[in-house]
C-alpha cells in the first residue's frame, strides 16, 4: 500500500485523488473486517485490529467507516476474505512481498503472477524471500513533525526499537506486541502518525542504481498496488537519490 533512497513501503496511486482515497479506504476497511473476524471485535483485546484501526485513523478514515467495518465482522456480514502472501523477485533481483486479502484465490494469484511476468519480475514460492525480512511494527511520521534528534528522543522514551529518518520522513520500528503502546506514547508527544501498521523490514537492502531498472520496478509495484485484492507491497530495494531525481 513509495519508493525513495531509504526503502519505504510503496503507495503510488494513479487517477483522481478521490478515486485513490476511495480505493485506500476500501483496503483499510477490508483489513479491519478481517482482523475483527480473526479475533475479538475489540481493538483493546485484538492487536491486529488495533493496528488496522490505527492505520485507518492515520489516513483520516471517518470513525463511522471504521465502526461499520468492525460491525460487519461481528455481525457475520460481508465476504469471507482469505489472507494470502506472495513472494517474488522484481527487476534487478530485488525481493518483494505482496500481502493480499481476497475472496477469490485463483483471480488474485493470476493477477499477481501476470504483474510480475509483464514487468520484469518472477513470482516465487512461499518463503522464497520472506526469510530476508523481519516482521515488525512500523509508525511513520512526516518530516515536519521534528528533526531527527527530536523524533529519536521521543521514540526512545516511547519504547521504540529503532528510528530511520530522512528528508521523506521518520520511520519508527517496534516489536509487534508493543506497537499499540508505542504509537499511543508517540501520539502524545508528536501528534497523530501518518501510518501505523505491521510491516516487513528487510535485513539487507538491494541497491537499484540503473534508471531503466528502477522505472520498471516502480511500474511493477504500481500494477500490484492498483489491484483491489492487494493490501501492501514491501521491498528490500534502495534507490540512489540521483536515480530518483531522474525519474522525477
From Swiss-Prot:
One MF term in the entry's GO annotations: DNA binding
Annotated segments matching region Disordered: 1-22
GO BP, sorted A to Z: regulation of DNA-templated transcription
Keywords: Cytoplasm, DNA-binding, Transcription, Transcription regulation
Listed Basic residues bias regions: 1-14
Membrane-spanning segments: none
Compartmental location: Cytoplasm
DNA-binding among keywords: yes
UniProt xrefs under InterPro entries: Integrase-like_N, TACO1_YebC-like_2nd/3rd_dom, TACO1_YebC_N, Transcrip_reg_TACO1-like, Transcrip_reg_TACO1-like_dom3, YebC-like
Lineage top rank: taxon: Bacteria
Cellular component, GO annotation: cytosol
SUPFAM superfamilies: YebC-like
Similarity field: Belongs to the TACO1 family.
PANTHER family, sorted: TRANSCRIPTIONAL REGULATORY PROTEIN YEBC-RELATED (PTHR12532:SF6), TRANSLATIONAL ACTIVATOR OF CYTOCHROME C OXIDASE 1 (PTHR12532)
Protein name: Probable transcriptional regulatory protein Sala_0337
Amino acid at each position: 500500500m513509495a519508493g525513495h533512497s531509504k526503502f519505504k513501503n510503496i503507495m503510488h496511486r494513479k487517477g483522481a485523488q478521490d478515486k485513490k482515497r476511495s480505493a485506500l479506504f476500501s483496503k483499510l476497511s477490508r483489513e479491519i473486517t478481517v482482523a475483527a473476524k480473526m479475533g475479538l471485535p475489540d481493538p483493546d483485546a485484538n492487536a491486529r485490529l488495533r493496528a488496522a484501526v490505527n492505520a485507518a485513523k492515520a489516513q483520516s478514515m471517518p470513525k463511522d467507516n471504521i465502526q461499520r467495518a468492525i460491525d460487519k465482522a461481528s455481525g457475520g456480514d460481508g465476504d469471507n476474505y482469505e489472507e494470502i502472501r506472495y513472494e517474488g523477485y522484481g527487476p534487478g533481483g530485488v525481493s518483494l512481498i505482496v500481502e493480499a486479502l481476497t475472496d477469490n484465490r485463483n483471480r488474485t494469484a493470476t493477477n499477481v503472477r501476470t504483474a510480475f511476468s509483464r514487468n520484469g519480475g518472477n513470482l516465487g514460492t512461499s518463503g522464497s524471500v520472506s526469510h530476508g525480512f523481519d516482521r515488525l511494527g512500523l509508525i511513520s511520521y512526516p518530516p515536519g513533525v521534528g528533526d531527527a534528534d527530536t523524533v529519536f528522543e521521543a521514540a526512545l522514551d516511547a519504547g521504540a526499537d529503532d528510528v530511520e529518518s530522512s528528508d521523506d520522513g521518520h520511520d519508527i520500528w517496534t516489536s509487534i506486541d508493543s506497537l499499540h503502546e508505542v504509537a499511543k506514547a508517540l501520539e502524545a508527544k508528536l501528534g497523530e502518525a501518518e501510518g501505523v501498521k505491521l510491516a516487513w523490514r528487510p535485513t539487507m537492502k538491494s541497491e537499484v542504481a540503473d534508471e531503466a531498472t528502477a522505472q520498471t520496478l516502480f511500474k511493477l509495484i504500481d500494477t500490484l498496488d492498483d489491484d483491489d485484492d492487494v493490501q501492501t507491497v514491501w521491498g528490500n530495494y534502495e534507490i540512489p537519490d540521483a536515480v530518483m531525481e531522474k525519474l522525477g
